[in-house]
Design a protein with these regions (language model features):
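Residues that recognize and position ribonucleotide moieties
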Residues: 42, 93, 141
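Short strand-turn motif at the edge of the Rossmann-like AdoMet-binding core
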Residues: 64, 98-100, 128
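Conserved short-loop catalytic and cofactor-binding motifs
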Residues: 37, 68-71, 154, 158, ...
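Conserved core of the PLP fold type I
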Residues: 1-90, 102-103, 108-116
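Short, intrinsically disordered, charge-balanced linker/junction segments flanking boundaries
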Residues: 10, 59, 179-185
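Conserved core segment of the aminotransferase class I/II
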Residues: 118-184
Length: 185
């Protein structure tokens, strides 16, 4: 959806090296050019990210900050702040793909990159599939109102809607307060 909304053929997307192979396949479908950003045990390296931003002038930065796929690394707190700051400094959209944030059962729970976004450059995407119902293909987006409306317009123009039954079940799951007990299992 983010690609449909923001990516044009030839646009550069900075990605962690390595990154989730299906994301690269989606970016390829939109004829974007992926450029890898180096990582270490604390996730992507901000100095390399800034260097690549200056060299490549990307349209988007794609990052999986928590339990990164395929490495399993988690982006440190300081680096989460740095990503948000660099996005604002260079006016680059960050797609924060954070489907695994709610399956942390030990260690420090870190705020998303979106938490440090003061300029609207970060779009955070999460998933209910990992915590509620695998295969339900339900997710959510956290972004400013203008971005949300743009994404809704693009989704409406390209896909009538996601199946209603999983949406209703997920809504009831949260409305009835089932999530806290489920999350602690």
């Amino acid at each position: 959806l983010a690609c449909q909304a923001y990516i044009d053929p030839g646009d550069v997307i900075l990605v962690e090296a390595p990154t989730f192979v299906q994301s690269v396949e989606i970016f390829d479908m939109f004829e974007a050019r992926c450029v890898g950003v180096a990582m270490d045990d604390n996730g992507l390296i901000p100095e390399d990210l800034e260097r690549k931003i200056r060299q490549c002038h990307p349209k988007m930065i794609y990052v999986i900050p928590t339990f990164q796929n395929p490495s399993g690394r988690t982006l440190s707190l300081e680096r989460r702040k740095a990503v948000a700051e660099l996005a604002a400094k260079y006016d680059v959209l960050v797609l924060e793909d954070d489907p695994y944030r709610d399956i942390r059962y030990s260690g420090e729970d870190l705020p998303p990159i979106k938490h440090f976004d003061t300029t609207g450059h970060v779009v955070m995407a999460g998933s209910f599939s990992k915590i509620f119902s695998p295969g339900s293909r339900l997710g959510y987006v956290v972004a400013d109102t203008e971005t949300i409306q743009h994404l809704v317009d693009v989704k409406s123009a390209t896909n009538s809607h996601t199946s209603m039954l999983p949406q209703i079940l997920c809504a009831e799951f949260f409305k009835r307060g089932c999530y806290p007990a489920h999350h602690q299992m």
